Amino acid sequence: MGGLWRPAWRRVVFCGWSWSHLGRPTRAAERAEPCLRPGRSGPAGTEQGLRRLGTWRRPSPAEQPARRPKSTNPYTRSQEEDWRRRNKTVLTYMAAAAVGMLGASYAAVPLYRLYCQTTGLGGSAVAGHASDQIENMVPVKDRIIKITFNADVHASLQWNFRPQQTEIYVVPGETALAFYKAKNPTDKPVIGISTYNVVPFEAGQYFNKIQCFCFEEQRLNPQEEVDMPVFFYIDPEFAEDPRMVNVDLITLSYTFFEAKEGHTLPVPGYNSNQQLSPASNL
């Protein structure tokens, strides 16, 4: 602390005891003194005080604390390598799972629809029908059901698609006819193909379609507009199913997707291997 205090100007000796009084501290000492108090101890306070005194300097690289050397223990190195290998394996499995889930999301929709078409489960209407059965059906007049219609278009298809009627009323055992309208507002021919669904799901096994445009390629030229009929009936057994007691509303929903020319699909619900093609459009 040399140079921080002025020389003593008074010294008293009394009975072997000496006492001296220092002069006033210099300005440098006044600036550094708060940083060098015991309460300000530590690297930050000491460095700040030395900076104010002008005696601080940055430590050289040789004075820096030595970094921790890499472990030379063979066991530790093998353990670190094992951890890295495990991390790579986990990342590989995660990437494979993500790709698998993406592929399953694309494949699940058509497979699920084909399953529902064949079994009549999951809210899909049954496509199979027999002419004798239709002719011999007995309508259940006291069981009135409201049928509503919905239309959707996939983002890849630039069509205008809508039902021509919002609702109709039918009874089990009675045939009904409804229409949808589709238009191609683009300047090029577009081929579309549709799927359908029935809500509530439990009513799908009783919803029978005699004639419709589903699973068939529909080619529309630029600015062309067509009407698409749906001929269907509700099976009379609908009125005998206790699960359908509170079902008075059924919704038939169609969704159109863009299809490639020449694409064919098997007709669900039929025992034959008949396929639909553009020539069989309704």
Swiss-Prot record:
Q: Can you name one GO molecular function term for this protein?
A: copper ion binding
Topology: which residues are Mitochondrial matrix? Answer: 29-90
Kindly provide the name given to this protein in its UniProt entry.
Cytochrome c oxidase assembly protein COX11, mitochondrial
Question: Gene encoding this polypeptide?
Answer: COX11
NCBIfam families, A to Z: PRK05089.1 (NF003465)
Q: Which PANTHER family does this one have?
A: CYTOCHROME C OXIDASE ASSEMBLY PROTEIN COX11, MITOCHONDRIAL-RELATED (PTHR21320:SF3), CYTOCHROME C OXIDASE ASSEMBLY PROTEIN COX11-RELATED (PTHR21320)
One GO biological process term is:
ATP biosynthetic process
Bilayer topology term: Single-pass membrane protein
List the stretches on the Mitochondrial intermembrane face of the membrane. Answer: 110-282
Targeting presequence: 1-28
- Function recorded in the entry: Exerts its effect at some terminal stage of cytochrome c oxidase synthesis, probably by being involved in the insertion of the copper B into subunit I.
Q: Which organism does this record belong to?
A: Bos taurus (Bovine)
According to the UniProt record, where is the region Disordered? Answer: 28-83
- What's the family? Belongs to the COX11/CtaG family.
Localization of this protein: Mitochondrion inner membrane
Q: Which UniProt keywords apply?
A: Copper, Membrane, Mitochondrion, Mitochondrion inner membrane, Transit peptide, Transmembrane, Transmembrane helix
Q: One Pfam family of this protein, by short name?
A: CtaG_Cox11
This protein's GO cellular component annotations are:
mitochondrial inner membrane; protein-containing complex
